[in-house]
Amino acid sequence: MSEVAVVLEKQEGGGGGGPSSIQCPMLKSTNYTVWDMRMRSTLKVHKSQEEDVSKGLINFLEPVLQNKNINVFIDEEEVRGKGLKNLFKRIQDSKISLAIFSESKCDFNDLLKNNESADEAIPIFYKVDATGDLADLQNSVKCKKDLINSAVEEMSKLLANISVGVYREKEANSKCFMVPARKLQMSHSEKLINWTWSSIYETPNDAAIEVAMLNEVHWLHMSGNFHTRNLTPGTKYEVVFLVSLDDTSSGWEQPVNLNLKVINPDGTESLQERETSLECHIGENWVDIQAGVLVAPPRNAAAKMTFTMYQYVTSDRKSGLVVKGVAIRPMQ
């Protein structure tokens, strides 16, 4: 199943003082909806507040995407009207952009000039009078349903090779499992002012890996879980957070705490706890921060593990941390 993430934000040009009425710097006098499409684990739709778009077009688009085996999650919690700097940064960083134009006159050439970094730009026109190349695109499609279906078909082709969820690293003879950052529970990860999501590309196959970049938090908490049924019984594994800290990182004078809990089928638990300094890793490449080790139990007694990294020193403003995910891998 191909999966992709989409961020939808309604921008309204001119007038009004409400949270959804702002001046758009990208397209003058244009009502439009931008989807910033980056490599994520689900199709995440931040709904427009405009009734016609959110209840009409998007409600139609959702089942069409699902029929094309693209998972959909509707998010109605997106911050609107404020803090748009992060939104435009995500648009600039994205490899695929899907723009929905509605009830306005606009020039598609302007959008392309402001999104030159994208590999693909896919437009959807909804009650719009178009000029320039956009008019030719609009007139080439007989109806909105055909246009949406063609856009979905293009997305499916472009995203066929995206790996999502818990996956096994594709290294030779590797039995390492990875829980990506998107699968972790992270404090304030849904807030753009606190975290920015982006994609990196790694060899050997240049697959896109989504990472979370910390802008600012005072209370840090990251946790996730994994089931040992996927592991080789009797093998000793380490559980490590894969992180990096850029040169501008701050607020890491105090150590972070880590723990690994294994919950057995009979309800008994084992807990490992430790602390370590992240400050000494500032400016380095990816580093492994170990949460603990375990020996995989027999599959008929498979257990669930949970892993956590936290630091609750609220007087420290923490920034600069980049999180790739958590690796569970055999120890040498």
Curated annotation (Swiss-Prot):
Q: Which residues form the TIR domain?
A: 38-163
Output the SMART domains linked to this UniProt entry: TIR
The protein depicted here goes by the name Uncharacterized protein PHLOEM PROTEIN 2-LIKE A7
Note the Pfam families from the entry: PP2 (PF14299), TIR (PF01582)
The record ties this protein, via InterPro entries, to: PP2-like, PP2-like/Lectin, TIR_dom, Toll_tir_struct_dom_sf
Any one GO biological process: signal transduction
Any one GO MF annotation of this record = carbohydrate binding
